[in-house]
């Protein structure tokens, strides 16, 4: 996959003719995947490259930083997902005021100069200054630019529109299963293990204390989750705590994971943490003994859930 990370690089590139999926794609959720998939099908049928034109920063980060929504994934994960979706050319550039000021016509003319022959777009995406570029404009003006338009309606899952906004709401409410259903994969956070206060070890449940890689991630509702953690290319079941440890005063928000059946040193390692189900909300305990008993119950529940999911996965493969 060819990766282009700036407008200057795009202008200088010599690209083969392509069909381009346009979008912020800030979650690469099932709705986004449908737009990309429709564009991919057209590209393969017409011997074109599959391009995705997207942004490495959310548009609001430069236009109205105070309104920028929490991120659903980092850029490294976004690039990885695009590779898995069969993208040939990924234009993943920062959204700047220069782009915001570009008219819809100028934006489409730029795409045509880059060899774009068809455009895939979701019904709710807009582009160009003032958001004047949209599906309606493309459908009425596409012949002027020599473009084929591949539009997709909003996707619904169990009656709910699949959107980054709804996924953020689900995560904030601790409904990570609903978020996963809309994402098409478990919600995942990447982080690097840093030294903690060692309280988990004293309680019999040593934890990896994560410093998140990237800023402004969507943080799930505080509580304990069953999850999985990727360490050195291997997945381990885990129970994950998100919160500020109310039993111990004056703690900042943190994410800590206790990995089952892992006993080596994790300090400095980069981990991918998937949250599968919220087991309970965060609680304050009157004693360390009561906290320890609850942690044992959390571990039992998490391991039972992970075993059940593993069994379902095995049956699905048969």
Which residue stretches match the model-derived regions?
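Short acidic-hydrophobic, aromatic-tinged amphipathic segments that line or gate anion-handling sites
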Residues: 2-9, 91
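A short acidic, often aromatic-flanked loop/helix-cap motif at beta-alpha or helix-coil junctions
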Residues: 9-13, 97-100, 156-160
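N-terminal catalytic cores of NTP/NDP-binding nucleotidyl/phosphoryl-transfer enzymes
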Residues: 11-74
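Residue-level signal for inorganic ion chemistry
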Residues: 29, 82, 119, 179, ...
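N-terminal Rossmann-like or analogous alpha/beta NTP/dinucleotide-binding catalytic cores
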Residues: 61-145
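Glycine-rich, Lys/Arg-enriched anion-binding loops that position phosphate/diphosphate groups
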Residues: 142-241
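Phosphate/ribose-recognition catalytic cores of enzymes acting on nucleotide-derived substrates
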Residues: 196-318
């Amino acid at each position: 996959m060819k990766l282009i990370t700036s407008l200057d690089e795009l202008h200088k590139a010599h690209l083969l003719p392509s069909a381009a999926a346009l979008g912020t794609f800030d979650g690469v959720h099932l709705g986004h995947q449908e737009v990309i998939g429709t564009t991919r099908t057209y590209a393969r049928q017409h011997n074109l490259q599959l391009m995705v034109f997207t942004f490495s920063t959310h548009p609001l980060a430069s236009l109205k930083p105070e309104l920028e929504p929490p991120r659903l994934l980092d850029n490294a994960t976004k690039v990885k997902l695009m590779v898995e979706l069969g993208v040939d050319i990924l234009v993943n550039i920062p959204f700047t005021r220069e782009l915001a000021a570009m008219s819809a016509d100028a934006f489409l003319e730029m795409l045509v100069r880059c060899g774009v022959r068809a455009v895939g777009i979701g019904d709710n995406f807009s582009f160009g200054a003032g958001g004047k570029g949209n599906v309606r404009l493309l459908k009425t003006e596409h012949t002027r630019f020599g473009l084929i338009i591949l539009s997709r309606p909003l996707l619904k899952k169990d009656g709910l529109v699949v959107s980054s906004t709804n996924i953020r709401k689900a995560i904030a409410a601790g409904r990570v299963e609903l978020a996963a259903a809309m994402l098409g994969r478990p919600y995942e956070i990447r982080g690097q293990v840093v030294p903690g206060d060692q309280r988990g070890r004293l309680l019999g449940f040593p934890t990896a204390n994560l410093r998140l890689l990237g800023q402004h991630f969507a943080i799930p509702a505080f509580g304990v989750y069953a999850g999985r953690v990727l360490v050195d290319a291997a997945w381990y079941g885990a129970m994950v705590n998100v919160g500020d440890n109310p039993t111990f005063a004056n703690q900042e928000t943190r994410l800590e994971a206790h990995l089952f059946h892992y006993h080596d040193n994790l300090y400095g390692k980069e981990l991918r943490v998937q949250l599968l189900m919220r087991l309970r909300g965060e609680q304050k305990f009157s004693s360390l003994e009561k906290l320890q008993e609850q942690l044992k119950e959390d571990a039992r529940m998490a391991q039972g859930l992970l075993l059940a999911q593993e069994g379902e996965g095995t049956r699905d493969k048969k």
